[in-house]
């Protein structure tokens, strides 16, 4: 990983190139997904951070809670060609993700509907869990993380971005934002539990992983952090 590489959102040209895959096929088509992905890429340092964390590994990536599959497009734009598999409980998003990926000709990429609260895929390689953890209760979070740790193989990495539990202004804004995402229908569930940094670190270290954790909120108002873990 390159220190400091994840402090800013993607440059304008890169963001437009990636978001372009989500533009409607016809001028009068629905531009919601295009506008959302472009705004996300231009404002959020998530993808530079995740791309940097995965760079240098050829391990297949499982993206748990993949949404529209934006990570797959960002990986390919970055020149990372490892197999990608995205799972999410939102069938509508998965349908759109698969359609856009096929239209864009994304190689070695697949998508499927899966509720991570009740089912886990079989996988060996790297695991990405991005802005998902808070939608599971504490017990389900612990089970998911133990299973994700067991999936790491070779030079595979566990890469997570999540809002952490604290009493900061950023923490309060994160909770409000997550509730709003549920109210407008973008997220199917309300947040259930925000983890704290030390509990996450302790659990993953018990699983035999080396853990790094640092802020990843850039210029956004949210209390987002990036966790990267790998086998010792």
What are the roles of these predicted feature ranges?
Residues 2-59, 68-120, 139-140, 159-232:
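Class I (Rossmann-like) S-adenosyl-L-methionine-dependent methyltransferase catalytic domain
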Residues 64:
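Conserved beta-strand/loop positions that form the S-adenosyl-L-methionine
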Residues 125:
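Conserved acidic residues
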Residues 128:
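A conserved beta-strand element that flanks and buttresses the S-adenosyl-L-methionine
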Residues 131-132:
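Short catalytic micro-motifs in class I SAM-dependent methyltransferases
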Residues 142-154:
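A short glycine-rich, Lys/Arg-flanked "PGG" loop and its adjoining helix->strand segment in the class I
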